[in-house]
């Protein structure tokens, strides 16, 4: 998994009954039901996340999945494939932002299982309306403008559902880039708790 922008990925060597076995660090963490979204949300990264979620559901449908997010956002359609899968599978998906969860990343953060959405103390969350630009004939521009408005309304509905804010508040607060500290994100309902130590995570 080339998550780290072509940087070398650390390997973990484990002793087994048949000798040593090497895993890249992300594959090893996947064994612990940890999934990462690092960087832009696009079709490639979304397909990786969806595949891992489905695999972990098949492995154990009754055990939580831990989804770590450090993302500036990206493609709405790619992000919605992750969102729909999170809602579709049986295991609870616990979400945590480390670094940033912006745009589609913030939607995925908020979409975690109720009571299991976390932020690290210095992480940042940003919500806004979807961005779009299109050139072409007037009729095509109109079609794309209506699609952007539809997507905006759908994302606002999702944020309202998971945050507990009313739709009017969400619509107003996403009119421009809206950056939040971990504390503000908790107040707003995008996360349930701020973690400083692992021991503070309830079982």
Swiss-Prot record:
Annotated EC: 3.4.21.92
Q: Does the keyword Protease apply?
A: yes
Concerning SUPFAM superfamilies, the annotation shows: ClpP/crotonase
Kindly state which reaction or reactions the protein catalyses. Answer: Hydrolysis of proteins to small peptides in the presence of ATP and magnesium. alpha-casein is the usual test substrate. In the absence of ATP, only oligopeptides shorter than five residues are hydrolyzed (such as succinyl-Leu-Tyr-|-NHMec, and Leu-Tyr-Leu-|-Tyr-Trp, in which cleavage of the -Tyr-|-Leu- and -Tyr-|-Trp bonds also occurs)
Listed under GO biological process in this entry are: protein quality control for misfolded or incompletely synthesized proteins
InterPro entries in UniProt: ClpP, ClpP/crotonase-like_dom_sf, ClpP/TepA, ClpP_His_AS, ClpP_Ser_AS
**Cellular component terms per the entry's GO annotation:** cytoplasm; endopeptidase Clp complex
Cell compartments where the protein resides: Cytoplasm
Q: Keywords assigned by UniProt? A: Cytoplasm, Hydrolase, Protease, Serine protease
Q: Does the keyword Hydrolase apply?
A: yes
Give a GO molecular function annotation for the protein: ATP-dependent peptidase activity
- Tell me the domain of life: Bacteria
Annotated function: Cleaves peptides in various proteins in a process that requires ATP hydrolysis. Has a chymotrypsin-like activity. Plays a major role in the degradation of misfolded proteins.
State the family named in the UniProt similarity comment for this chain: Belongs to the peptidase S14 family.
Subunit details:
Fourteen ClpP subunits assemble into 2 heptameric rings which stack back to back to give a disk-like structure with a central cavity, resembling the structure of eukaryotic proteasomes.
NCBIfam families given for it?
clpP, PRK00277.1, PRK12553.1
Q: What's the protein called, per UniProt?
A: ATP-dependent Clp protease proteolytic subunit
Q: Which organism is this entry from?
A: Dichelobacter nodosus (strain VCS1703A)
